């Protein structure tokens, strides 16, 4: 995922976002390092992940 798209999805629950197949919420994005802080929706843990590991489903939840 590119940094611009990741920034649009910060704290969003309207679009499903995944990091290595695990559902997450993007909490912050560092465009310089191309890393994002993500929180797991499964267990609440927060990790730093490369933007390349983050995908969105393209499905908007209402």
From Swiss-Prot:
Top-rank taxon, per record: Bacteria
Disulfide bridge map: none
A GO CC term assigned to this protein in UniProt: endospore-forming forespore
Major location category of this protein: other
Single GO biological process annotation from the record: sporulation resulting in formation of a cellular spore
Family annotation (Pfam families): SspH (PF08141)
Name of the featured protein: Small, acid-soluble spore protein H 1
Record gene name: sspH1
